[in-house]
Amino acid sequence: EYNIESTNPNRENIYAIRQDSPMEEGELTTYTTAMAAEQIKNNYAEVESMLRMSTTSSNHYEYQGSKMADAIAIQMDSTLLHFFPYEVKEGSLKEALTTPNKMALTETYAQKVFGKKNCIGEVIESINAKGERKSYQIAAILKERPQSFLQFDMLTSIDESFFGGVTLLKLPQGADKDA
């Protein structure tokens, strides 16, 4: 039995954009440029919602000068809850996904790094491969969703450097997905 997102009430209405790969003839890719995703959303009235996402460019994260445990970090649109029913344990997911330099952590990752300490409001630093630093304030702690399509430890909003990534569309029940 196929169990990924089996408890998601939106499961039957979520579609990933796939297109011909420019790198490999005859292959499909789920990479969509930021501009193409916006054009699809604006040109097809049947699209209820769009969710763009991509891994971040961070090499590692630090808290108070110490390197944190390895983490999968994803930047995404604020429409996450239109697609996936995440439950917030503490804080505001909306703030994490709409305010620059804010972030949400999974409950498991927060416990791994901070133990039982309430980490809402704490600041962590992202360090990319060039050594450039960017600070994020923790705005939310999310409960894990078993067998979720999305696998991550940290979430943040899409920033100005977003060029593209995976794009999901939410269509209404019964919509012609091939149109």
Segments the model singles out, each with a brief description of its role:
Residues 1-18:
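Alpha-helical transmembrane segments
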Residues 6-7, 11, 39, 48-51, ...:
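Extracellular low-complexity Ser/Thr/Asn/Gly-rich intrinsically disordered segments
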Residues 15-18, 51, 166-169:
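Active-site-flanking beta-strand signature of metal-NTP-handling nucleotidyl enzymes
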Residues 77-90, 101-179:
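Mid-to-C-terminal secondary-structure elements
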